[in-house]
Amino acid sequence: MVSRRIYRPRDLFSLMQSTLATENFFISAYEIGIVDNFPEIRVQAEVSARENRVRRFGGEPEILISEIYDEILKKHPQLSPATVKKIIDLEIQMEKIVLYKNARGSCLFEKAISDGCKVILISDMYLPSVILKELLTSCGYDISNIPVYSSGEERYSKNSGKLFSIVKKNENVDITSWIHVGDNVHAD
């Protein structure tokens, strides 16, 4: 349904780094060290958060963005919680900037809606569903009455099939009449 204007998802962190380096972002001199290596710090924090999730709870390494930034705070205690909140907000804002409505996905979505199909959106993503809805809305989708599931919130992925089981149960849908459209042959 959406695509990014960047080559790899992690390129978002390089874009964030440029913004973090501006005077307008108000990172103190004490906190500035994070800017120089932000893309690597952000990637490693996500890896650590996933590993810690599995080590502590077992199961799948599905996490939320807050857990990623908790890892950054652990390794960079000089950051204030207020700065971390601003960086999380920046990441979400940057996602809005790089995301755009995918023509093929949009056509399929609109066709399903116009045909009266029950549409449910499922994402393997560390962002909570409320933020996913915000991102989709900013791309021009009307999803006001459409359920959105995030693997991070549910703690299960599409790849394992467990996220689909949760959706099936919660939405009371018959799996034999289910049509799933995705962009990843392995996960979808």
What is each model feature region?
Residues 1-10, 14-17:
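Asp-based phosphoryl-transfer active-site loop
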Residues 1-5, 48, 52-58, 67, ...:
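Short catalytic/ligand-binding loop motif for oxyanion handling, primarily in non-cytosolic enzymes
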Residues 16, 23-90:
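A metal-dependent, Asp-based hydrolase signature
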Residues 84-137, 148-149:
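Substrate-recognition element of Asp-dependent hydrolases with the DxDx(T/V) motif
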Residues 136-142, 169-172:
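Short, surface-exposed basic-aromatic patches at helix termini and helix-loop junctions that form
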Residues 143-147, 175-177:
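Short acidic capping loops at alpha-helix termini that bridge into adjacent secondary structure
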Residues 153-159:
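Catalytic cores of eukaryotic secretory-pathway lumenal/extracellular enzymes that build
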Residues 161-186:
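Conserved Lys-Pro-Asp/Glu-containing loop-to-beta segment of HAD-superfamily phosphomonoesterases
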